[in-house]
Structures are given as C-alpha cells and as structure tokens.
Amino acid sequence: DVFPVRGLVAVYVFITGLYGAVVMCGDEERGLFLPLSYGYRIPCRVASMAAPAIMVSISGLLALWAGGVMTSFPREAAAMAGYCCVVIASAWILRLVCRRPQVLCCIIPFLVIGSLVFCPVFVDAGRFFPGLDQVGRLFPPWYYLQMFR
C-alpha cells in the first residue's frame, strides 16, 4: 500500500521538525537561552524546537481529513502525537550530532529525498527491490506509515 496524502503529511511533519531544530540551533548560537536559569534552558529549547512540528501536525490532521483518508479522529490524533514526539526526538539527536545549524540545513535535502524514496509515500520500493524497505526504517515517516498498513 502507498499513502500519498498520509505520506506527504508524514514527510512534511519530519521536514518541519528538522527546521525547528535548525532554528533552535540558531537561537542557541545567538544566546537566546542564556538569560534563562539552568533548569529552564532544556525545556525551553525543546519547546522552541517542538512548536513548529506540533503546529504542522495539527495542519496535517486537517489535511488527512480534507483528503478523505482519516480513519477515526482519536486514532489519527494519537498516531500523529506519537509520530510528532518521534520527529522531535530524532531532530534533537541530529541537532546534538550536527551542532551547527548550517550542517543540519545541509542534510535536510538528503533526509527528505530518502524519506520520499524509501518510505511508501508514492511507491513501495520494497515490493520491487527486496531490502529497500529495510532502508526505509532509517527514516521516521516509515514508522508512521506502518501504523496504517
């Protein structure tokens, strides 16, 4: 099965989560979080990074509804909330690895292309080339899309 609307929403949320990490890295470089007490810095960083992904997740739910692919709202909302948490966590890890917003910006196109090619957004490449579905497991959209198989 392929999921064009659902797949595009998944990739869009992933891109926005990565964008949130880029913006948060830039805010860190400018010293935005330095005036905060130490106990508030990490929660504020996470909130700053998560805000775009959460807003896009809500818009993604509306796109699923408008596209006529929403199954049941509670199930969709729970799946999207879990997926949003996975996207934020993976963006946080990539931010720790890359450290600079410029480096993170440079890897976003590769992650997007990988998500579109190896996850069943338009074509399930794993059906035609065994093993490619295993590569899809490297990308968060793959897990979200598997919840609706």
Question: Where are the model-predicted features located?
Answer:
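Hydrophobic alpha-helical transmembrane segments of multi-pass membrane transport proteins
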Residues: V2-G67
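Transmembrane alpha-helix boundary/anchor motif
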Residues: L8, Y12-G20, L61, C85, ...
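Hydrophobic alpha-helical transmembrane segments of multi-pass membrane proteins
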Residues: V9, A21, A50, A77-A81, ...
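Membrane-spanning helices that line or support transport/gating and their immediate boundary helices
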Residues: G20-L32, A89, I93-L96, R127, ...
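Transmembrane helix-loop junction
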Residues: G26, L64-G68, R95-L96, P120, ...
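Alpha-helical transmembrane segments and their short interhelical loops
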Residues: G39-L116
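Transmembrane helix segments
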Residues: P101-L138, W142
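Short, membrane-exposed interhelical loops at transmembrane-helix boundaries
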Residues: P141-R149
